[in-house]
C-alpha cells in the first residue's frame, strides 16, 4: 500500500512499523526528533504497525504540543518507576500529563518530602540514562487483574474494572509495568529535561470519602533551555502570587475560623474592588443595561424548574426556612427571569438587558480552593439579555465588543473558544444547534478567530469562553457569553410581537470580568501588585523630611483630595529613605516628597514607584500628571475615566 508522509508518497509493506516507514521518508536529522506517529487522528507508538487503511502518516515531533505531551506522560511513568525502586510497599494509581507537566498519585505510609523529591530525581536520571524502551502489550482484563493483584497494586484493579473493553493495554519500561492506553516515546532516554516541582495531597478519584494520596508534580521539556525558561517563569509567578501580595499590600485575607473559600476584604482591597465595580456600573449603564439586585436564596422548586437541581445540585447549598426548602443561588439567571416576568413586554421593549453585581455561592471541594482564583462565595458581573431571535446576533456582537473594550483597558490579550453541549444538559438538539450556530455566526461575522471546545458548555446552553493572557503567558478564563433557548421556555418568558401574538424570546447569559474576586486575583498577579494608577487604592503618598513640613503636607493632602486624588500622608519621624522604600514596597504610584525647598515653592518632589524622579512640581501639575496617567488606559476603547 501507499502512504503519504509530509507530501511524499511511500510504498509500505504489510506489517511494517511506523518507525521503519517514517525513517524511510524523513531525513536522519528530522527522524531523530520523531517520538510517535499519527494516522487518521490516532496517535501510535513508533513500534506500532502502520494500519492497513492508513492514507497519511504524520510524524509527531518532540517540539510539537503532542510530542511535549508524550514526553511528560512518559516522564510520569519514569517517576513512578523511581518511586517504586526507592520506597518499597508504595502503591501506584494514575499519572497523566497535564497542562504544564505531569503528576503521579501514590499511596504510601507517609507524605513525600523535599528530600524525597531530590532522591526521586536522582533515580529518574539513572532510568533515563538506561534508555529502557517503552514496550506495549495487550491482555484480557482478567489476565491484567491477576497480574496487578499479584503485584499488590489494588488501585489498578479498580481502574481495570472501569475499562469498557475486554482487552487492556500494558506498558513496560525496564522492570516497571503500568496499565496505560499510551502511546509513549520510544525509550526513557528521550526525556532530555525534567524537574520535580512539588508534593500535594489528593483524594483517590477526587472523592473526599476515599484515601488521601501523595501527588508528586513534575514537568518536562524537549531541552534544557525550555525547562530553564519555564522554571524562571515559575519563580516570577511565585513573586507575583496574589495570596502573598494580598498580605503584603494588606488587600484581603482568609479566616479559616470563619469558613474556607470566603474572602475578607481589608480597606485597601475593598477600595480596589469598589473602584472596579463602579467602573463596571458606569460602563453597563452607557451600553443600555439596567441595574438590578436580587435575593441570595430562592425556593428550591425554582431550581428544580430551571434544571439546576438536577444538573448542578452538587455545587449548591440548601437550607429550610419555615419548613420550606430553599437553595442559595449559584447563578443569577433565575432571579433575573422573575424580574422580567413581573411585567408584560412588547417587542418594542426588547432587548431587555438586566445587570447585577450578584453575590453567588458554589460548593467547591476544599482541595481545589486557591486564594481569590477559586472560592465558594464570589461576585459575578452578571447580565442577562432577553431579546427577539432576530436581535440575537447583534446582542452577542455587542457583548463581544464590550469584552474587547474592557480587556483593552487592562492591556490583556485574549482568545476565544466555543464550548458545545456537555453530556449533562437540558434542552432539545434543535435548540442547542440554533444557539451554537448563533454564537459561531457572531464570531465569524466579526472576523474573530476561535476554537471549538467540545462538551464544555453550560448545562442549559453553549457559550463563548474568553481566555485572557497575562504577562507570564498564562491563560485565565473570565468572560463568557452563553446563548439559551431552553430557560425562556421553562419559565414561560414571552413578549407581544407586532402581530399581537405571544412569542418566546431568547436569553443571553454573559459576564465580562466573570468573578470579581478571580479577576482581582489575576490583576494582582499580572501587575505584580502595582495596580494601574486609576485602580490603585492609594494613588499618591506625601512624605515629609522633618516635622517642619507637616502643616504644608496636610494642606497638600486636602488640595489633592479635593481634586479626586486618593492620597495619604506619612509624617512619621523616620528617615526619608526608609519612608520612600516603604511606599515603593506598597506599590504606591506617586511618592511626593516635601522638604523645606518644596514648602517654599508650594510644591512637591515627584518620584514614581519604579524609581524615576520627575523633580519639583506644583500641586496643580501633580493633579494633571496623575489624571493623565489614569486616563491613558481608557483611550483605546473610546472610554473616559471619571474622577467623581
Swiss-Prot record:
Residues 1-61 form the TGS domain. Residues 241-532 are annotated as: Catalytic. Gene3D superfamilies: 3.30.54.20, Anticodon-binding domain (3.40.50.800), Bira Bifunctional Protein, Domain 2 (3.30.930.10), Threonyl-trna Synthetase, Chain A, domain 2 (3.30.980.10). Binds 1 zinc ion per subunit. It is found in: Cytoplasm. CDD domains: ThrRS_anticodon, ThrRS_core. Its EC number is 6.1.1.3. It comes from the Bacteria. One of its GO terms (molecular function) is ATP binding. GO terms for biological process: threonyl-tRNA aminoacylation. SUPFAM superfamilies: Class II aaRS ABD-related (SSF52954), Class II aaRS and biotin synthetases (SSF55681), ThrRS/AlaRS common domain (SSF55186). One of its GO terms (cellular component) is cytosol. The keyword Aminoacyl-tRNA synthetase applies. It is an enzyme of class 6 (ligase). Keywords: Aminoacyl-tRNA synthetase, ATP-binding, Cytoplasm, Ligase, Metal-binding, Nucleotide-binding, Protein biosynthesis, RNA-binding, tRNA-binding, Zinc. It catalyses: tRNA(Thr) + L-threonine + ATP = L-threonyl-tRNA(Thr) + AMP + diphosphate + H(+). Zn(2+) binds at residues 333, 384, 509. InterPro entries: aa-tRNA-synt_IIb, aa-tRNA-synth_II, aa-tRNA-synth_II/BPL/LPL, Anticodon-bd, Anticodon-bd_dom_sf, TGS, Thr-tRNA-ligase_IIa, Thr/Ala-tRNA-synth_IIc_edit. Its cofactor is Zn(2+). PANTHER family: THREONINE--TRNA LIGASE, CHLOROPLASTIC_MITOCHONDRIAL 2, THREONINE-TRNA LIGASE. Belongs to the class-II aminoacyl-tRNA synthetase family. Homodimer. Catalyzes the attachment of threonine to tRNA(Thr) in a two-step reaction: L-threonine is first activated by ATP to form Thr-AMP and then transferred to the acceptor end of tRNA(Thr). Also edits incorrectly charged L-seryl-tRNA(Thr). This is Threonine--tRNA ligase. It comes from Oleidesulfovibrio alaskensis (strain ATCC BAA-1058 / DSM 17464 / G20) (Desulfovibrio alaskensis).
Amino acid at each position: 500500500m501507499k502512504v503519504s508522509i509530509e507530501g511524499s508518497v511511500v510504498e509500505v509493506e504489510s506489517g511494517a512499523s511506523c518507525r521503519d516507514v517514517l525513517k524511510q521518508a524523513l531525513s536522519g536529522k528530522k527522524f531523530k526528533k520523531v517520538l510517535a506517529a499519527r494516522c487518521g487522528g490516532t496517535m501510535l507508538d513508533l513500534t506500532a504497525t502502520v494500519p492497513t487503511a492508513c492514507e497519511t502518516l504524520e510524524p509527531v515531533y518532540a517540539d510539537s504540543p503532542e510530542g511535549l505531551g508524550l514526553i511528560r506522560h512518559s516522564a510520569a511513568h519514569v517517576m513512578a518507576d523511581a518511586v517504586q525502586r526507592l520506597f518499597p510497599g508504595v502503591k501506584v494509581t494514575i499519572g497523566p500529563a497535564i497542562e504544564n507537566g505531569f503528576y503521579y498519585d501514590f499511596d504510601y505510609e507517609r507524605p513525600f518530602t523535599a528530600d524525597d523529591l531530590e532522591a526521586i530525581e536522582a533515580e529518574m536520571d539513572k532510568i533515563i540514562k538506561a534508555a529502557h524502551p517503552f514496550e506495549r502489550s495487550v491482555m484480557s482484563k482478567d489476565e491484567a487483574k491477576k497480574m496487578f493483584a499479584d503485584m499488590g497494586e489494588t488501585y489498578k484493579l479498580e481502574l481495570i474494572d472501569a475499562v469498557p473493553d475486554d482487552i487492556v493495554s500494558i506498558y513496560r519500561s525496564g522492570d516497571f509495568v503500568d496499565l496505560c492506553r499510551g502511546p509513549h516515546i520510544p525509550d526513557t532516554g528521550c526525556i532530555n529535561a525534567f524537574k520535580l516541582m512539588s508534593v500535594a495531597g489528593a483524594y483517590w478519584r477526587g472523592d473526599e470519602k476515599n484515601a488521601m494520596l501523595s501527588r508528586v508534580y513534575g514537568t518536562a521539556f524537549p531541552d534544557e533551555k525550555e525547562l530553564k525558561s519555564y522554571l524562571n517563569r515559575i519563580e516570577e509567578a511565585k513573586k507575583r502570587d496574589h495570596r502573598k501580595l494580598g498580605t503584603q499590600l494588606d488587600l484581603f485575607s482568609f479566616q479559616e475560623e470563619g469558613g474556607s473559600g470566603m474572602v475578607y476584604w481589608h480597606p485597601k482591597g475593598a477600595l480596589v474592588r469598589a473602584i472596579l465595580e463602579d467602573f463596571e456600573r458606569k460602563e453597563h449603564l452607557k451600553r443600555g443595561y439596567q441595574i438590578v439586585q436580587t435575593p441570595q436564596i430562592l425556593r428550591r422548586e425554582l431550581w428544580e424548574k430551571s434544571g439546576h437541581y438536577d444538573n448542578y445540585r452538587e455545587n449548591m447549598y440548601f437550607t429550610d426556612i419555615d419548613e420550606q426548602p430553599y437553595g442559595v443561588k449559584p447563578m443569577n439567571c433565575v432571579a433575573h427571569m422573575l424580574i422580567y416576568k413581573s411585567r408584560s413586554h412588547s417587542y418594542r421593549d426588547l432587548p431587555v438587558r438586566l445587570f447585577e453585581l450578584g453575590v453567588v455561592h458554589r460548593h467547591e471541594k476544599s482541595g481545589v480552593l486557591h486564594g481569590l482564583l477559586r472560592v465558594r462565595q464570589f461576585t459575578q458581573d452578571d447580565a442577562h439579555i432577553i431579546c427577539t431571535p432576530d436581535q440575537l446576533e447583534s446582542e452577542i456582537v455587542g457583548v463581544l465588543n464590550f469584552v474587547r473594550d474592557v480587556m483593552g483597558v487592562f492591556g490583556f490579550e485574549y482568545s476565544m473558544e466555543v464550548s458545545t453541549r456537555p453530556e449533562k444538559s437540558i434542552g432539545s438538539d434543535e435548540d442547542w444547534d440554533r444557539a451554537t450556530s448563533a454564537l459561531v455566526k457572531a464570531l465569524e461575522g466579526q472576523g474573530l478567530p476561535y476554537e471549538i471546545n467540545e462538551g464544555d458548555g453550560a448545562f442549559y446552553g453553549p457559550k463563548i469562553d474568553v481566555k485572557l493572557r497575562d504577562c507570564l503567558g498564562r491563560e485565565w478564563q473570565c468572560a463568557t457569553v452563553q446563548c439559551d433557548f431552553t430557560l425562556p421556555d421553562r419559565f414561560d418568558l414571552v413578549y407581544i410581537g407586532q402581530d399581537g401574538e405571544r412569542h418566546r424570546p431568547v436569553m443571553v447569559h454573559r459576564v465580562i470580568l466573570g468573578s470579581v474576586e478571580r479577576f482581582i486575583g489575576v490583576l494582582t498577579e499580572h501587575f505584580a501588585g502595582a495596580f494601574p494608577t486609576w485602580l490603585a487604592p492609594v494613588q499618591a503618598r506625601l512624605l515629609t523630611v522633618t516635622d517642619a513640613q507637616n502643616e504644608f503636607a496636610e494642606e497638600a493632602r486636602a488640595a489633592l483630595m479635593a481634586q479626586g486624588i486618593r492620597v495619604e500622608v506619612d509624617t512619621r519621624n523616620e528617615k526619608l529613605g526608609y519612608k520612600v522604600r516603604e511606599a515603593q514596597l506598597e506599590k504606591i504610584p506617586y511618592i511626593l516628597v516635601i522638604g523645606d525647598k518644596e514648602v517654599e515653592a508650594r510644591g512637591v518632589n515627584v518620584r514614581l514607584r519604579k524609581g524615576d524622579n520627575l523633580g519639583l512640581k506644583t500641586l496643580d501639575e501633580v493633579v494633571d500628571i496623575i489624571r493623565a496617567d489614569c486616563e491613558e488606559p481608557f483611550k483605546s476603547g473610546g472610554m473616559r475615566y471619571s474622577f467623581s
